[in-house]
Amino acid sequence: MADGKERPIHENHRARMQERVAHNGMESLAEHEVLEYMLYLAIPRHFGSFCRVMEATPQELMQVKGVGPRSAQLISDIMEFGRYYAVKKRKKQATLDTTANAIEYIKPLFLGLQNEVLYIILMDDSCHPLYDLKAAEGVPNHVSIDTRKLLRDVLRSNASTAILAHNHPTGPALPSATDQLTTLKIMQLLAPAGISILDHIIVAGENACSMADRGRLPDISAHPGILNAASTDF
């Protein structure tokens, strides 16, 4: 009997929320109502904010009472869809010949990511992007790169220039000593293939910085050694 009484109440509530959105848009809803409207779930008190819900893993979401595997996966996929949309919306004829253009192009790649990811933006000699190569992905502050696979993938692109880009999920958008070493190793790896690394962009949330602009991009002529290992940790 209790279940039978609850259903109409919830259905009427959902109908009222749908009417509000139809007439006044999503902005008419409170933050917790956005999630409730989307999946008819409990308010996001467990995570503290809408953004944290969107960034949570399916396993974390399922710790909330009433959230099953399908709902958890759907919430998780929404962030993926958002990132996919942002990446696809970028200008197709972009020229990454300025720091501002490079950052604008690169930032969507890291939207909502909680793990550290390293990309190599492969370009022609006019700085037109050819391909966004995901070189490595790992836990925050640590990635491992298969250098042989990386070199094979890069050579297939016919690129002549490139920009490195990675995110700091838990830290500021500032280059560390490890970031500089990573940059140098990749420069050494790609130099024999005729590919020049023009910059390394670091993204942290809404912030980003250029190692080249900060004078932190390594001078490969001062470190001519070649990276021979099949894989390396950064």
Describe the role of every protein-language-model region.
Residues 146-148, 177-184:
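Charged helix-capping and loop-helix junction motifs
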Residues 86-102:
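Long, charged amphipathic helices and adjacent flexible linkers at domain junctions
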Residues 103-157, 161:
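Histidine/lysine/aspartate-rich catalytic loop segments that bind and position anionic ligands
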Residues 184-234:
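Divalent-metal-activated hydrolytic enzyme cores
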Residues 161-172, 196, 202-203:
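Histidine-centered catalytic micro-motifs
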Residues 1-41:
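Charged, compositionally biased N-terminal leader segments and the immediate start
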Residues 31-55, 72-88:
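Amphipathic, charged-and-aliphatic alpha-helical interface segments
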